[in-house]
Each structure stands twice: as structure tokens, then as C-alpha cells.
A protein has these predicted regions:
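Conserved RecA-like P-loop NTPase helicase motor core
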Residues: 123-133
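RNase H-like, metal-dependent nuclease domains and their acidic two-metal-ion catalytic environment used
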Residues: 1-107, 114, 133, 137, ...
């Protein structure tokens, strides 16, 4: 396949590969949006695949569905997961994906820069807090700067329609984006999460940590008295 900078489906690699995982509520679908930075233009973001997980999945079944997608990419992606609606999901994700998981708490305010290292079972996870409007504005700025490339397909168009359909309200604190009643924004939010992660100054540190955890460990050598005789 010939490389085309405007078609992420032709990109041989992403630097790095990221899966943005929006965790839906009971009436919404959880999603996985896969992409990352271009191999030849670090500021160009490519969105290669957009997936809506089956409705009604929670906990381990939801993580298993995400793991199926992850295996299609050789289990080599950073997982950026929205933990806003279910903080306990962090434990399941950590058990399934290990140190590749970065948690995101989407709230009313926050710039998503200073993480909290939250204890999770016998380990810990970085959790970043970001305002919903701030997250969407970041993605909007990337779109306006022509720094995002979507794979062509119905799911990309659905994500665009979700973003385009958001209602805006101007308040003293800034613009508030809300989803109209009966509509969904899960794919659109996942795209914004992907863009946030791809532009984050901690990205290289996340990659280094994930790479170190996947590195095979040398077995510890033990020496008996026979080794010295």
C-alpha cells in the first residue's frame, strides 16, 4: 500500500499507537478509537479506526472486548481510558493491559497536565483530570489547524456528526458543550481523548514506562557451592 499522508489507513506505524477508550454509561456504548501521530509528521494526528463496543458490557467483559481490538494491533498501544463514570474499572484495566494504561477523569474543569498517582490493587495508575470543554476545545483547535486526518468510513462520519451536534452554552466560566437529549457523543469524545494524549508533554514518558514493563526480565542467577569448586 502506498503511503498517503492524508489517509491513516496507509500509515505503516504510528508514533506511538494509542487507543482512546471512552467508557459509556448504561444507555451508551463504550468506544475505542485507534490512531496516533504520523511517522513522518509528528504534529499530524491520524485516526485509523473507530469502534463502538457492544452495549451492556461492564467490568471484565468490557475490558475483554477492548483486548480483542488491542490484539489486532499486536498489544502495542497505549490505552487512554476515561474513568469518570466508573473509577473501579481502573483495576480491571490494569490487570488486563498493565502499565500501558493512562487514566483520564473528565470533569467540569482541569487542564489534564498534573497527574495523580492513584493506588490500584498492588500497583498504581496515573490519573489526569481534564475539563470536558477544555478537552473538546483542544481537539477543535487541532481540527482548525488541519492537523487531524480521519480514515474514510461511516464511523468517522458518525464521530464528526456527534461533535458537530454538540450544543454550546456561553457562561462566565467559558463555553460549555453538552450532548442533546437522546443523542450520543462517545465517539467524538474518544477522538478528543486521542488528540489530547498525542499532544501531551508526558507522552514519551508513558511510552518509556510501557516499554520497560514489556521488556523481558532476565532470570535471576543463583550460585551454589559447586560453582566455586
Amino acid at each position: 500500500m502506498i503511503f498517503n499522508r492524508d489517509d491513516p489507513n496507509t500509515w505503516p506505524i504510528f508514533r506511538p499507537l494509542i487507543i482512546a477508550h471512552d467508557v459509556g454509561r448504561s444507555r451508551d456504548r463504550s468506544t475505542a478509537v485507534i490512531g496516533g501521530n504520523s511517522p513522518v509528521q509528528p504534529r499530524l494526528l491520524g485516526i485509523k479506526e473507530l469502534v463502538e463496543l457492544p452495549q451492556g458490557l461492564y467490568g471484565s467483559p468490557r475490558a475483554s472486548a477492548l483486548a480483542t481490538i488491542d490484539r489486532n494491533y499486536n498489544c502495542n498501544a497505549l490505552i487512554v481510558a476515561d474513568l469518570s463514570n466508573d473509577p473501579t474499572y481502573a483495576e480491571t484495566l490494569l490487570e488486563t493491559f498493565g502499565a500501558r494504561v493512562i487514566g483520564l477523569q473528565i470533569t467540569r474543569a482541569g487542564e489534564g497536565m498534573n497527574p495523580e498517582r492513584r493506588p490500584v490493587k498492588n500497583s498504581s495508575m496515573l490519573i489526569y483530570t481534564i475539563g470536558r470543554s477544555y478537552l473538546l476545545e483542544l481537539f477543535h483547535a487541532e481540527l482548525q489547524a488541519d492537523q487531524v486526518r480521519f480514515v474514510d468510513g461511516p464511523m468517522s462520519r458518525r464521530a464528526y456528526e456527534q461533535l458537530n451536534g454538540l450544543e454550546t452554552e456561553f457562561r462566565e466560566s467559558g463555553i460549555v458543550y453538552s450532548c442533546p437529549p437522546g443523542q450520543h457523543d462517545d465517539l467524538g469524545i474518544s477522538c478528543a481523548m486521542l488528540a489530547w494524549a498525542a499532544r501531551h508533554p508526558h507522552l514519551s514518558a508513558w511510552v518509556d514506562t510501557a516499554s520497560f514493563e514489556r521488556r523481558p526480565r532476565r532470570p535471576r542467577q543463583t550460585f551454589g557451592w559447586a560453582a566455586f569448586t
